[in-house]
């Protein structure tokens, strides 16, 4: 029973971590989508600057778009991976929860007959 309780807590923590990570990735996805939309509106010969630390570095329009698209691809893949991990953990969580309920039912004293 103790082992099941530990596993239950670990899975609960794992699921919370996945949910937090998914929220962060969704925010990054939204931000990068907005950046890409803004880059689409800008003329190809416009000056684009990328902040690297405290410095602004000039970047070509095409290079900026390519970098943002690459980031978006990566973020989408990470979201898919985490969603899959979350699903697997939720299934395991349900199994452990069921096992705990069964163990508690087996350990409970029988009801006296009326």
From Swiss-Prot:
It comes from the Eukaryota. Coiled coil: none annotated. One of its GO terms (biological process) is protein folding. InterPro entries: PFD_beta-like (IPR002777), Prefoldin (IPR009053). One of its GO terms (molecular function) is unfolded protein binding. Keywords: Chaperone. The keyword Zinc does not apply. GO terms for cellular component: cytoplasm; cytosol; nucleus; prefoldin complex. Pfam families: Prefoldin_2 (PF01920). Binds specifically to cytosolic chaperonin (c-CPN) and transfers target proteins to it. Binds to nascent polypeptide chain and promotes folding in an environment in which there are many competing pathways for nonnative proteins. Heterohexamer of two PFD-alpha type and four PFD-beta type subunits. Belongs to the prefoldin subunit beta family. This is Probable prefoldin subunit 6.
């Amino acid at each position: 029973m103790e082992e099941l309780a530990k596993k239950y807590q670990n899975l609960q923590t794992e699921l919370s971590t996945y949910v937090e990570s998914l929220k962060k990735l969704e925010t990054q996805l939204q931000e990068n989508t907005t950046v890409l939309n803004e880059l689409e509106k800008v003329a190809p010969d416009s000056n684009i600057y990328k902040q690297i630390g405290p410095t602004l570095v000039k970047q070509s329009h095409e290079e900026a778009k390519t970098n943002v698209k690459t980031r978006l691809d990566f973020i989408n893949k990470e979201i898919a991976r985490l969603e899959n991990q979350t699903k697997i953990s939720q299934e395991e969580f349900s199994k452990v929860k069921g096992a705990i309920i069964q163990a508690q039912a087996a350990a409970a004293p029988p009801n006296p007959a009326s």
